[in-house]
Amino acid sequence: YDDEGERIAGDIESPAQVLATAAEAPNTQTPMTQTPVVQESQALATARQALKDDDYSMDEDIRDIFIEEAQEVLAELGEKIPVWEVDTHELVALKDIRRGFHTLKGSGRMVGAHQIGEMCWAVENMLNRVLDGTLAVSDALVGFIKDTHRKLPTLVEDFQQQRAPSIDPAVTVLQATNLLQQQPINTGLPETNGLDN
């Protein structure tokens, strides 16, 4: 600007000059941190593909009956599992535990709670092997039963609210398969998907 407040022609920057100045200015923005993508294993992908999506088309009254029954079965399992944990040779408690998962499997499939049904079938199938003597009880197996029992109330609540499972049932299915094949329980799982999750 001159003394009269008029803009001097030489002071007017052309669009090209503005762009050039911007290009020369240092970039002060913090680069975005990229979250590493965890590649899902083929085993986990296969377990996931075997799971059917939940179906909420069943009559609401029937779904409510299932929710009530599931809560009762989970309460009973909460009593039986500690008894069996103390003495894993105690077959009465083990049969009761197996029956509880069998009930949840059947009723879950019937009302459209397929994620719960398949999770419980994976456990029931494994316990059948324990009962017929073809699969030995291990600390990992006991921990798996306890962990699955801990997860199920969340899945029951998810189904009641008609929302997608907030816990991945495919993890439980794969862990059961690993135990059946006498492999380390978390084979094929990312480190964050162990028994503590």
Regions found by a protein language model. Name each.
Residues 1-197:
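Non-catalytic helical tethers at domain boundaries
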